[in-house]
Amino acid sequence: MKELTYEEVLDQIEHQRRFGNRPGAEVSALMLEKLGRPQQNMSVIHIAGTNGKGSVSAFLCSILKEAGIRTGMFTSPHLVDFRERICVDGQMISREEVTKLGNMLLEEDFGTVPTMFDYCLAMALLYYRDRQCQAAVIETGLGGRLDSTNAIGVPEVTVVTKIGYDHMAVLGDTLDKIAAEKAGIIKKGTKLVLESQEKDAMDVLLETAEKEAVTEIKIADMHDVTECRYENGRQYFSYQKYKNLEMAMLGVHQYENAAAAILAAEIFLKDRGISDEKAEYYIREGIKKTRWEGRMEILSREPFFMVDGAHNGNGVAALAESLRTLFPGEKFHFVMGVMADKNYEEMIEELLPLALDFKTVTVESERALAAQELSEKIWAKGICDAGLLHSFDELMPGRLDVAHKTIAFGSLYFVGEIEKYFQDVTKITKNLQIY
């Protein structure tokens, strides 16, 4: 078999069956076993949840980088570049490494047909092993119990972020059912960090933790988050003993994500004998330096244009709360592109009170809701105007309303399309530093 180019490797991997068609960690477990268990010499932090997984991952990796712990980060989906999924110390994997590892994996006979997600996870862990990573922050793709990442074994720390209604056709239609799937990553011997949850979800998580004899449980309680303020494009807050923390990440929901990352980092650093004084410095600097594209990210300040990957009811509720807090009394132009299997009616309802108008887009995905249908749904509410966005060129700074802010949201895939368009038009490629 001739060696594939970078583009051919991606084409081969991305055309494998998607993880949603065959849930389960068995294939990934088989692959990793055949590859010599590349994860065995690194400490893993495993993260599940409906919202906030990527942000918590980014915060954690930034903190561990400050501590001098070489850390791999595995997330999905990517926004613009496939390589965003696989990073070490904030740097994306190179095209050459993707090509080399991709060729090796595609030539291997695993005795079954891996999904795209199986291949991505295997590539990530091989890369982290080659780079001699001491730690890996691994984000689940879908759920937890049947997710490919559950093949990694027992993580040192497990984190479960906010649980809400998403992927209900696969995970279940009630919070306790969804929580049971997420709780599938909680294993005997791990240490557990939880974000605050609705009672039905929290009960399931705590019952699972008790059943699995989890050695330590910490809960990121928002009552411990104080002195929050927004100033000059940055947020400041205090959490427990950490006073006046600074972060570039925007949104009120990021306070809780940062708190969860702090608790997980405390456990991880303490396990390595790092003093509280040093740990506080690493945490403070790591939180301050974290960047995470596509999450309340400002692409233009004058005129103002922000993109946010909120793609379910809870995520859009957090976006709405953040906009009210950061820009009190203002109304916004919204640009929306969603998947047809999402609860887009709830998403619309959350933002209608803040809307001047909506423009809708058909996302480039077979799962996308048509822009015309979405526009008609908004129009039928009778609250504000709704129309179609005919070209991303309408979102360029020279075409935006200077008097009011414009916010694009609804899907990470949609945000990725906008990010790529901005890069292509401005010819500015963002630094390969992810966080």
Please tell me what each predicted stretch does.
Residues 2-4, 153-154, 267, 311-435:
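ATP-dependent carboxylate-amine ligase
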Residues 25, 32-40, 66-153, 171:
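ATP-dependent carboxylate-amine ligase catalytic core
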Residues 41, 130-131, 135-140, 146-159, ...:
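Nucleotide phosphate-binding/pyrophosphate-handling subdomain across enzymes
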Residues 179-187:
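Membrane-proximal helix-turn-helix segments that form the acceptor-binding/catalytic region
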